[in-house]
Amino acid sequence: MVDESPSLMGQPVAFKDIVDVAGVSTTCGTEVNVGRTPVKDAPVVQRLTAKGALPVAKANLQEFSYGILGDASAYGRVINPRDPEICGGGSSSGSAALVACGALQLTVGSDSAGSVRVPAACQGCLLYTSPSPRDRG
């Protein structure tokens, strides 16, 4: 018998708090955006939920995704679960921390200047980034 359920059926996923999830506040790590609640999912959320993934959390980030340390957010510094003395990296530090501490197996960050690569390296996480720009976002 062939399992025809979506490939990510029931897989919990967190999204960096710069990614819009309908009905959930998107703050971009700043108090300026408190109360900004999108009515539509971002394309990456649409694609993953169509495959059965379950959005369960928004991940903290460097304010406005601007920085590589993960230490500047209205919601506090992201602590590296592997070693609190080492920076969590940024800007997708919260996404990496959720994987590094074992809370989730799948999170979504964003990367323009190392924003996913740096926290993955700092926190010892496996990183996948699509080779195709059309698959991003």
PLM features per residue range, with description:
Residues P131-G137:
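Single conserved hydrophobic/aromatic residue that forms the stacking wall/gate
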Residues G10, R117, T129-P131:
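Selective for proline/serine-rich intrinsically disordered segments
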Residues R117-Q123:
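Structural signature of FAD isoalloxazine-binding scaffolds in flavoprotein oxidoreductases
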Residues S73-G76, Q123-L127:
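Short, hinge-like loop/turn segments at secondary-structure boundaries
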Residues M1-A113:
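Gly/Ser-rich catalytic/binding loops embedded in alpha/beta enzyme cores
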Residues A57, L127-T129:
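Structural signal for conserved beta-strand scaffold positions within catalytic alpha/beta enzyme cores
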